[in-house]
A protein has these predicted regions:
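Active-site-adjacent segment of SDR/Rossmann-fold oxidoreductases
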Residues: 1, 19, 35, 40-50, ...
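Hydrophobic structural elements of the Rossmann-like NAD(P)H-binding subdomain
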Residues: 10, 52-55, 96, 101
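Residue(s) in the substrate-gating loop at a strand-loop-helix junction
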Residues: 14
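Active-site "substrate specificity/gating" loop of NAD(P)-dependent dehydrogenases
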Residues: 20-24, 64
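Catalytic tyrosine of NAD(P)H-dependent dehydrogenase/reductases that use a Tyr as the general acid/base
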Residues: 27
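Active-site helix of classical SDR
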Residues: 30
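A glycine/serine/threonine-rich, flexible loop-to-helix segment
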Residues: 43, 47, 54-75, 109-119
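C-terminal helical subdomain
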Residues: 72-165
Length: 168
């Protein structure tokens, strides 16, 4: 793919990885790992026009047969998911997206991080976290990062501001 300066990779994730599903801890962990692999390969392949995505299908399959009522099983046909794979593997595919697909519905899953709170210098403790929990968990101003170092930079900036440090 690097040599031809073009490539498309589509991993299969799952709502069991994105949101959890009772009794599927091993399956959910493996499917969530696809997001980490996608994120890293996206960063490594972007300069070579390699686009990497995940599909999170919801379909009536051998794994879900007997778990879903028959009308739902029929509605969630694998054929209703197939166009998503073709799109994600196409010439104009996006990159670093998790596309959910099922029953003719399509949606993008996004992972966001709250602004958070810095507890330096005196409140870095379980009790400090508990006392600040409402602010730590506040969804206002959530951010979507494009790389792990963006979170590192955010945390360093918050700590420096709290302590009055200049990081430049």
């Amino acid at each position: 793919m690097r040599e031809q300066n073009y490539g498309r990779i589509v991993f299969t994730s799952s709502s069991s990885g994105l949101y959890g599903n009772f009794g599927q801890s091993n399956y959910g962990a493996a499917k969530m790992a696809m997001l980490g692999l996608m994120n890293t390969l996206h960063l490594e392949g972007a300069k070579n026009n390699i686009r990497v995505n995940c599909l999170a299908p919801t379909a009536g399959t051998a794994m879900t047969e007997g778990l879903l009522p028959e009308p739902v099983f029929k509605l969630l046909s694998p054929e209703a998911v197939s166009p998503a794979v073709v799109f994600l593997a196409g010439l104009d595919a996006p990159s670093r997206k998790v596309l959910g697909a099922g029953g003719g519905s399509f949606a993008v899953f996004k992972g966001f991080e709250t602004v958070g709170v810095n507890l330096l210098p005196d409140n870095v403790s379980p009790e400090g976290i508990a006392a600040a929990w409402d602010n730590i968990n506040d969804p206002a101003g959530m951010q979507e990062f494009t790389g792990g170092f963006e979170q590192t930079g955010k945390f360093a900036k918050q700590g420096a501001e709290k302590l009055g440090l200049d990081l430049s």
